[in-house]
């Protein structure tokens, strides 16, 4: 695959998952929508933390979109997703649809950066075939 195709495929993947996170996860938290606030008690979190979690998540996603800070943003987002995975697992949510959802998002986000960053590909070379 040419570098240009990898670059634009990586940005496409990053853009799709960033938009998803910002619209489906961050925005409801910042708006204190019931879909974000109500589950907090079930998860064992104080519902008052929903806006702070939304801000942290939003900052992580925005850092992922800025090339010089993308790696730091993804490291922070990976930590946040790890917390979400642990929270879902602790309350015994369904494994493939809920618990592992953070893994799916993380793999897609890291895959997008890997495709668009020759520097990351040199550090983490994947040899297929």
Question: Model-derived features: where do they sit?
Answer:
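Extended, low-polarity transmembrane helix blocks
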Residues: 1-24, 66-129
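Generic signal for short, ordered secondary-structure residues
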Residues: 4-5, 18-19, 38, 54, ...
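Short hydrophobic/aromatic-rich motifs at helix boundaries and adjacent loops
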Residues: 7-11, 31-34, 56-58
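Solvent-exposed, well-ordered loop and adjacent helix/strand elements within mature globular domains
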Residues: 19-49
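Solvent-exposed, flexible loop/coil residues
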Residues: 34, 47-49, 53, 95, ...
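A general structural signal for well-ordered alpha-helical segments in protein cores
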Residues: 37, 52-55, 59, 72, ...
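Core segments of alpha-helical transmembrane spans in multipass integral membrane proteins
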Residues: 45-65, 78-79
